[in-house]
From Swiss-Prot:
One of its GO terms (molecular function) is toxin activity. Keywords: D-amino acid, Disulfide bond, G-protein coupled receptor impairing toxin, Gamma-carboxyglutamic acid, Hydroxylation, Secreted, Signal, Toxin. The keyword Disulfide bond applies. Belongs to the conotoxin C superfamily. Consomatin family. May represent a new lead for the potential development of an analgesic that acts via opioid-independent pathways. Consomatins evolved by gene duplication of a 'Somatostatin and related peptides (SSRP)' gene expressed in the snail neuroendocrine system. In addition, this peptide adopts nearly identical conformations as in the somatostatin drug analog Octreotide. As this drug, it contains a D-Trp at the same position, whose synthesis is a common strategy used for enhancing the metabolic stability of compounds in drug design. It comes from Conus rolani. Residues 1-22 form the signal peptide. Its main location: secreted. This is Consomatin Ro1. Expressed by the venom duct. The cysteine framework is C-C. Residues 23-57, 71-81 form a propeptide. The modification 4-hydroxyproline is found at residue 69.
């Protein structure tokens, strides 16, 4: 907990120190963000990480290396009305 506190304090000092030297808030914020980071790059990375529909409709669910077929694919449940 103490480490998190000191990290927070140091980040506050790191952000506010340039302001005391006459810097503008926008310049300080821009200094924290990499130059090559653009909204298009962020959107592209989010889209590439999204799961495709094929992954969502997968027929098997595996838990602890034990894979069970999905309910709609189990043949023993069909016709038991």
């Amino acid at each position: 907990m103490q480490t998190a506190y000191w990290v927070m304090v140091m980040m506050m000092v790191w952000i506010t120190a340039p302001l005391s030297e006459g810097g503008k808030p926008n310049d300080v914020i821009r200094g924290l963000v990499p130059d090559d980071l653009t909204p298009q790059l962020i959107l592209r990375s989010l889209i590439s990480r999204r799961r495709s529909d094929k992954d969502v409709r997968e027929g098997y669910k595996c838990v602890w290396k034990t894979c069970m077929p999905a309910l709609w694919r189990r043949h023993d449940l069909k016709g038991k009305d």
